[in-house]
């Protein structure tokens, strides 16, 4: 799927794969392999997107807990503009499934993190509800931001009242909690100002950004202005769990800007 950009890649490969995790036997096999690979790599801390399925996401947390790794794991929320097999009925159903998952997500080292996939697949009501849940329970948040130009254009249609992508999260309170935003490849200056003001942590994912032709994040500029930036492998758009490979790619692509 590396011949596709983000949105086409999601529809052609990622969403069909994620739909399979409704089957717990499949989820156990796939997540077992993932956790084993992670354990064998140089990674000891991970922040992970699950799928929309509460039971499968809890299973992933159980496997990570047993591995000895320290992690944050998110049950994904999506109630619009995604395949029917993954689309939750509405905001209320998505929030109820999240509460169900949180009730079972009680581990010493695998912690929950709220995970709206991205603005295009989440209604305003869902984003607002997740923001309220984050504030009420003191939970961190992770999502995607300004990864791809097509994605950014897609946000403008359902959110005409916002001047830039991150405002759609911020007006729902999702940047007010401890927050990780993946990618941030195409953040305009005013978006960078907001991320800095809210203390958002950027997960720079150079392997996946190269593989999906998303662009090269201006990480040196982000660091110079005091933004917090770390590295992410972003499986499976990134092809390895090994963060040493990610470090090498970050250096390599930074020379091309």
Task: Give names to the regions the model predicted.
Residues 171-178, 220-257:
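His/Asp/Glu-enriched, well-ordered alpha-helical/loop segment
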Residues 187-200, 205-211:
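Long hydrophobic segments that form regular secondary structure
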Residues 42, 64, 114, 144, ...:
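Divalent metal-coordination and catalytic microenvironments
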Residues 46-47, 141, 230:
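Hydrophobic residues within beta-strands of alpha/beta enzymes
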Residues 76-79, 147, 206-210, 235-237:
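Short, acidic/turn-prone active-site loops that include or flank metal/cofactor-
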Residues 55-185:
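Metal-coordinating catalytic core of metallo-dependent amide/deamination hydrolases
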Residues 31-38, 201, 209-211, 255-257:
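C-terminal helical cap
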Residues 2-69, 94-107:
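Alpha-helical scaffold segments that flank or form the walls of functional sites
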